[in-house]
């Protein structure tokens, strides 16, 4: 890792932000955002469909521009930043990894539910064999205790993962809950792999939780410029960088340049601000996967029910990523109850 930072920041505006934009990024938008983030010193930029490689589908939403084309544009634009991609085993396939690398991406981020790390083993093996840097995502990390999360992290590390992330997919973790999980992974993995943290703003704690993760030993942190992500968005990179500057943590990112990028380049590409509104708040409170927001709003409108109530019910059922279709069942259930 370069000495220009104490921690490495990955900007996920062009992947997590795809949920908020309903996967409608254009090539020009990717070119502009990558150029601005790269100029500001962001070391890693993630680019894919919101649900990762292969996510463009009837169930998750179709991409306006094929994700592999967007990856190629990002690689051609970036002068210093590395381009990363996300994939969920079973949604994306191993051939997608090969194509993304052929298009110039150099960091493979593989995500599983926090109890299913074993499904990533062959994908990490392929990525390492091909010389890609590897990152693992343990999603919905709030839903199991730290010691169980650490055991899942060990599975990823043994498979070849070089950094395992505590992923607060629902934005449900609160401060010490982040620290406890990061510390558990640091203790389990030691020098075998780094630990990272990916947060959401659904309880307004994205930056605070990210700082808690850094203090607990995390070496890689995700964020999205202008909070451009699912739910209420991710930890805003510009705010996180500002806080890091104040507490003496080096990110290698220029605060003023990233603030300009957020205002002048990223915001114009957003369909609307990512808000901590009632629906997003309910996701954080009930522990609902952040990408469910737009799906819930669509089904609530279709069936004439409350999207907030729909999300709370989804939280009680402990739905996970990939179960978005069950929102229809819940909406019908609520509709019958309100007749």
From Swiss-Prot:
One of its GO terms (biological process) is L-leucine biosynthetic process. Substrate binds at residues 15-16, 169, 198, 289. Its EC number is 4.1.3.39. The record marks 15 as: Transition state stabilizer. Pfam families: DmpG_comm (PF07836), HMGL-like (PF00682). The keyword Lyase applies. The active site is at residue 19. It catalyses: (S)-4-hydroxy-2-oxopentanoate = acetaldehyde + pyruvate. Mn(2+) binds at residues 16, 198, 200. It is an enzyme of class 4 (lyase). The keyword Nucleotide-binding does not apply. Keywords: Aromatic hydrocarbons catabolism, Lyase, Manganese, Metal-binding. Gene3D superfamilies: 1.10.8.60, Aldolase class I. Residues 7-259 form the Pyruvate carboxyltransferase domain. InterPro entries: 2-IPM_HCS-like (IPR050073), 4OH_2_O-val_aldolase (IPR017629), Aldolase_TIM (IPR013785), DmpG_comm (IPR012425), DRE_TIM_HOA (IPR035685), PYR_CT (IPR000891). One of its GO terms (molecular function) is 2-isopropylmalate synthase activity. Belongs to the 4-hydroxy-2-oxovalerate aldolase family. This is 4-hydroxy-2-oxovalerate aldolase 3. It comes from Rhodococcus opacus (strain B4).
